[in-house]
Swiss-Prot record:
Gene name as annotated: hisS
Pfam families: HGTP_anticodon, tRNA-synt_His
Source organism per UniProt: Vibrio atlanticus (strain LGP32)
Protein name: Histidine--tRNA ligase
Entry's family note: Belongs to the class-II aminoacyl-tRNA synthetase family.
GO molecular function, one term: ATP binding
Segment forming the signal sequence: none
Keyword line: Aminoacyl-tRNA synthetase, ATP-binding, Cytoplasm, Ligase, Nucleotide-binding, Protein biosynthesis
InterPro entries the UniProt entry points to: aa-tRNA-synth_II, aa-tRNA-synth_II/BPL/LPL, Anticodon-bd, Anticodon-bd_dom_sf, His-tRNA-ligase, HisRS-like_core, HisRS/HisZ, HisRS_anticodon
């Protein structure tokens, strides 16, 4: 007997029992970004490897350890996208979107990283990303944070997330800070683990993000990045904080927050929850004012964020916020000669006249008891029963599966009756 083929480790099926909650999250995301006037962009899931090496950074964990990279038949190195910002920037440059005007864009789809699978961290995962090009003030940074706060309220999780902010300054600001930080770390080299020692020479700011408790303990005495910020970076961050204060969004300044990708500058932020254990970040973003030019476009200010949909779904499950709209409202029960086609016609009539109604026809035969059992199983609230007599009389038996009442009504008035019950 042939061995069953399994899904790749860390890449999961989304089953019919799970997809309604996913659809709820995705619908909320689309509703919120549309309310702010942002436009959708769709990019390929495969890009040239060089795009991520240049954008994300050769020394980042994402590029050095986690990417799914392969050579195609022409010998070109290609990579399944590990994140969305680089591809979005590439698309904007290639299609001249940011030569003419500012752009406010969003996208949603699968990303891929070869990580150790665990709860909230998968090898195929889904992100929604929002990116703004051509605006440099703290006002648009604040709008993106306000947008995410609105989404949390829509999903009912706003009391279970907290916002952390930081400014990592400009590239120029970080040069002198990097020197001071490396000098400090060298004084405590015996405390650093191998990963921190590597980061100290490749990207010292990433040491601030370590999860090693021994290293965290010494970082309390490390130089503070805020003391090395230039006046422009300080004013930008102060402006952002002032705007958030004005709209009542609470936040905590976390001077160790640096994010894991090299393209960030000035504002960085994360929304964090305690509901998911170690995988507590549900959304993160910041400014990347140099990335467009770095990838061959003209110098363009930019800011954005990405959120992990798996983590949002997990969070809602953990908080038992799983109520979703039923997948079937009306179940067509039919038995007898000529009833099947009549049932299909009546179902289509309902779909045409009752907005948003979800009607399922019974197929495969079976007595009324079997069909009603199926109606209960799919969660229908109304059953419409057609027998030979009903077909002849142009009527239908309407049964309220919640209240238990039933009545015989004309097929011309059934739409009104159904609309009142669902």
């Amino acid at each position: 007997m042939a061995k069953n083929i399994q899904a790749i480790r860390g890449m999961n099926d989304c089953l019919p029992t799970q997809s309604p909650l996913w659809q709820k999250v995705e619908s909320a995301v689309k509703s919120v970004v549309s309310a702010y006037g942002y436009n959708e962009v769709r990019m390929p899931i495969v890009e040239e490897t060089n795009l991520f090496s240049r954008a994300v950074g050769e020394e980042t964990d994402v590029v050095s350890k986690e990417m799914y990279t392969f050579d195609d038949r022409n010998g070109d190195s290609l990579t399944l996208r590990p994140e969305g910002t680089a591809g979005c920037v590439r698309s904007c440059i290639q299609n001249s979107l940011i030569n003419r005007d500012e752009q406010r864009l969003w996208y949603m789809g699968p990303m891929f990283r070869h990580e150790r699978p665990q709860k909230g961290r998968y090898r195929q995962f889904h992100q929604c990303g929002v990116e703004v090009f051509g605006l440099d003030g703290p006002d648009v940074d604040a709008e993106l944070i306000m947008m995410t706060a609105r989404l949390w309220r829509e999903l009912g999780i706003d009391k279970h997330v907290r916002l952390e902010l930081n400014s990592i300054g400009s590239q120029e600001d970080r040069v002198s800070y990097r020197t001071a930080l490396v000098a400090f770390l060298e004084q405590h080299i015996d405390v650093l683990d191998e990963d921190c020692k590597r980061r100290m020479h490749t990207n010292p700011l990433r040491v601030l993000d370590t999860k090693n408790p021994d290293v965290q303990a010494i970082l309390g005495d490390a130089p503070r990045l805020s003391e090395y910020l230039g006046e422009e970076s300080k004013q930008h961050f102060a402006g952002l904080c002032e705007l958030l204060d004005a709209v009542g969004i609470e936040y905590q300044v976390n001077e160790r927050l640096v994010r894991g990708l090299d393209y960030y500058n000035r504002t960085v932020f994360e929304w964090i929850t305690d509901s998911l254990g170690a995988q507590g970040t549900v959304c993160g973003g910041g400014r990347y004012d140099g990335l467009v030019e770095q990838l061959g476009g003209k110098a363009t200010n930019a800011v954005g964020f990405a959120m992990g949909l798996e983590r949002l779904v997990l969070m809602m499950e953990t908080l038992e916020l799983t109520e979703v709209r039923r997948s079937v409202d009306v179940y067509m029960v039919a038995a007898g000669e000529g009833t099947m086609i009549a049932g299909m016609q009546l179902a289509n009539q309902l779909r045409d006249t009752v907005e948003g109604v979800r009607v399922m026809n019974h197929f495969g035969g079976g007595n009324f008891k079997k069909q009603f059992k199926r109606a209960d199983k799919v969660g229908a609230v109304v059953a419409l029963v057609l027998g030979e007599n009903e077909v002849a009389d142009n009527t239908v038996v309407l049964k309220d599966l919640v209240g238990g009442e039933q009545q015989t009504v004309s097929q011309t008035e059934v739409a009104e009756k159904v609309a009142a019950l669902i």
